Design a protein with these regions (language model features):
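Active-site lining segments of carbohydrate-active enzymes
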Residues: 369-381, 393-473, 522, 534-544
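Long alpha-helical HEAT/HEAT-like repeat alpha-solenoid scaffolds in very large eukaryotic proteins
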Residues: 516, 530-594
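Alpha-helical junction/boundary sensor with strong preference for TPR arrays
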Residues: 309, 350, 402, 427, ...
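Well-ordered alpha-helical scaffold segments within catalytic/enzyme domains
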Residues: 296-315, 319-333, 379, 390-408, ...
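Glycine- and aromatic-rich loop/turn segments at beta-sheet edges
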Residues: 250-287, 348-379, 424-444, 486-505, ...
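Carbohydrate-recognition beta-sandwich/jelly-roll modules
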Residues: 2-392, 396-422
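Exposed, low-structure sequence patches enriched in small/polar residues
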Residues: 495, 535, 579-589, 599-635, ...
């Protein structure tokens, strides 16, 4: 790497062509200062600011990655802002901005008060908002220019990143402008606030931080980002996450699942959506077969584990309480019997033939398509493709599992057939299974990826049908048409609108498509499906935390030494972490197995390890009582954001017991244990 001074405050880094330009400035007492001299050596640059001090850069060329270690040596007392400014030769072409887990295609799809290009052309975001600190990428159709930083370890040095005309600027201390997004309904105007400063004492201050730069020939933005992550992973620390052992993890998760089962008063059962959530518990007063509760998947897990013998007192007690709750014998069929009662409960959700509304309001005795928090309450009386796809897939699996315990349950398969017929007839000419449908099979909303769950459901049902069954041919035709549509979404990068409690670009859109493509590949082994799956997998990587982000040491998460590495964030609308990574890990392992691309196996391992954290045990119930053993919080608020706009619950706070976390993580664990057991070795 050659270093050329191009102005009194700038140097250009070159190899065979221009790599980037570095600008050296300091802000002292509100005024921008430039160096009086730049001292350039073979692999270092020193900017001399006279009595203020120096900035010293050491450069390390690691192939396609440049590692820049910067030391600020500040000698004069006062207020400072530190800037790290990178730019590249963009040939005056328009740059598109990408920030992992935060800014995708200008965030212009959806509804909500989250940051977008429509609200402002320029933004600055704190490093704690993105899955790699201060990571941002500019693409101009010819090059991909990316920067990132190691995480801050002190609140004073938490940085922010903002795009510039030809580059990116990292500032310390960080600030968010022109707005700070702090909750689903909270976008705080910060345009009139003074920028924060670093107060340097009379004895001076030295501070060192490492930055990472990449300048790639343009492939796709997401492909370039994945390459950047792969290069960075070779340099990042490999500290293991502190979590409980898998045997106890499994027992406690099953304990929580059993304790969520409720008797409906008529001998049937459902899963409680969540409990003990204080001031926001009213939000959780419904159950469902799918999505936020996943009662039917929970039933499938119970049925599959009916012969499992407990090793902990907590699990034994949960089984005994369950038997008492339903006046059953605590034997090897207990969990299967209760699973059947859950399945039977949701047979009531069929409003007319093949029209399935699986959300049930426990207070008002109302069935609906989706009754939770969302941006579109007008859809509650319709049926949703995601909910139907999830529920029917689990009905098929539950019927097969109960059969192994001697329980023939043809009503579940009959219902699945009727719902399948509904979607075969409703499927749009494009191949889409839509999003929201009226009871008459008319589309209410066709945007997003919800219909991919119908594709996965069909892939689960098809192997059970005989070749003489006319439904089989119809389903095969439908999934092929659906693949044409959803593969085009993946090609266009249109990963949008999958979660029902938000309306934005979200990671679950990528997971839905990846799962469908892999399910269809498992059925037919068409290599084209793996190409489409790669596009979805690349999109998902941005939501996986690659570093341990800064957490205030005195916060709940900080006190528990919680690590963000391997955790996943939700969407551009929901800036919190969750444990969805167990489900993603299984899909990544399938993809890696079929393609040999071990990058995705490595990413899967990160997520699996992260999901061992923060599970309530017999000795630590995470602030609750022993009836919550096995609960794991849904929302981990690592940054300045909270779902319900509660300012006290930001930056290191965890909260919300909700059934989907228990069900999804336990079910994914079972799949990984069956198919990829080596990934669970401790």
């Amino acid at each position: 790497m050659h270093i050329l001074q191009t102005s009194p405050e700038k140097v250009e880094l070159r190899s065979s062509e221009s790599f980037c330009t570095l600008a050296y400035t300091l802000t002292f007492e509100g005024k921008r200062r430039t160096p009086c001299a730049l001292i350039i050596k073979e692999a270092s640059i020193t900017a001399d600011f006279g009595p203020l001090g120096t900035i010293e850069d050491r450069l390390l060329d690691r192939g396609n990655l440049l590692v820049l270690t910067r030391s600020w040596n500040l000698r004069q007392q006062g207020s400072y802002r530190l800037q790290v400014a990178f730019s590249y030769d963009d040939q005056e072409l328009e740059n598109k901005l990408f920030i992992p887990a935060l800014w995708y295609q200008d965030n212009n799809k959806g509804k909500g008060c989250f940051p977008s290009a429509e609200r402002s052309a320029n933004w600055s975001f704190l490093e704690t908002r993105m899955s790699i600190p201060c990571c941002a990428q500019l693409s101009n159709g010819q090059r991909l220019f990316t920067c990132a930083s190691e995480p801050a370890t002190d609140q004073r040095f938490v940085a922010s990143v903002a795009p510039d005309r030809h580059g990116l600027i990292i500032s310390i201390p960080g600030s968010e402008w022109p707005y700070s997004y702090q909750g689903k309904q909270s976008l705080v105007d910060t345009s009139s606030l003074a920028l924060p400063c670093l107060e340097v004492p009379s004895q001076g201050l030295s501070y060192t931080r490492t930055f990472y730069l990449s300048n790639q020939k343009a492939g796709s933005s997401l492909e370039g980002y994945c390459q950047f992550v792969q290069q960075l992973s070779e340099l990042s620390p490999k500290d293991k996450t502190e979590g409980i052992g898998w045997e106890h993890w499994f027992e406690y998760k099953l304990t929580r699942l059993i304790n969520l089962v409720q008797n409906d008063g008529n001998g049937l059962a459902y899963l409680l959506m969540g409990e003990g959530n204080g001031e926001v518990q009213d939000v959780y007063a419904f159950t469902s077969a799918s999505f936020l509760v996943k009662s039917l998947q929970g039933a499938q897990e119970l049925a599959s584990l009916t012969k499992y013998q407990p090793k902990t007192k907590a699990l034994a007690a949960a089984r005994a309480n369950l038997a008492t709750k339903f006046s059953l014998v605590d034997n090897h069929l207990l969990l299967a019997e209760v699973a059947k009662r859950i399945g039977d409960f949701f047979l009531q959700a069929e409003r007319s033939e093949g029209v399935f509304q699986d959300n049930y309001d426990l207070v008002n005795d109302i069935w609906g398509g989706y009754l939770g928090i969302g941006e579109h309450p007008e859809f509650k009386s319709m049926v949703n493709s995601r909910c139907n796809g999830e529920a029917m897939k689990q009905y098929v699996l539950l019927a097969r599992t109960l059969q192994k315990s001697g329980m023939e349950e043809l009503s579940y398969l009959s219902l699945a057939r009727r719902v399948a017929r509904f979607y075969c007839e409703a499927q749009l000419s494009s191949g889409s299974f839509g999003r929201w449908w009226t009871e008459k099979g008319k589309p209410g909303d066709i945007q997003g990826t919800n219909g991919a769950y119908i594709g996965s459901f069909f892939c689960t049902l098809i192997p059970l049908l005989s070749d003489e069954d006319p439904l089989k041919a119809d389903l095969l035709s439908a999934v092929h048409q659906a693949y044409s549509f959803y593969s085009e979404l993946a090609y266009e990068g249109a990963f949008y609108g999958d979660t029902l409690d938000a309306d934005s670009c979200d990671k679950e859109a990528g997971v839905a498509l990846l799962s469908f493509f892999l399910d269809l590949y498992d059925l037919e082994h068409d290599k084209r499906l793996l190409e489409s799956a790669k596009l979805a997998a690349q999109f998902i990587v941005q939501w996986i935390w690659q570093f341990d982000s800064f957490l205030p040491p005195g916060s709940e998460l900080g006190q528990r030494n919680f690590r963000t590495r391997g955790m996943t964030s939700v969407s551009v609308a929901h800036h919190h972490l969750d444990f969805y990574g167990m489900a993603i890990a299984y899909e990544f392992l399938r993809y890696a197995h079929w393609t040999g691309d071990m990058f995705y196996q490595e990413q899967a391992k990160l997520m699996i390890e992260a999901c061992r954290q923060l599970v309530a045990t017999e000795t630590d119930q995470l602030g609750r009582d022993e009836t919550y053993i096995g609960w794991q919080p849904e929302q981990l608020n690592h940054t300045t954001w909270e779902y319900f706009n509660r300012t006290h619950a930001m930056q290191g706070y965890y909260d919300i017991d909700i059934a989907w976390v228990t069900v999804l993580t336990l079910g994914s664990y079972q799949l990984i244990l069956e198919k990829f057991p080596s990934m669970l070795e401790e």
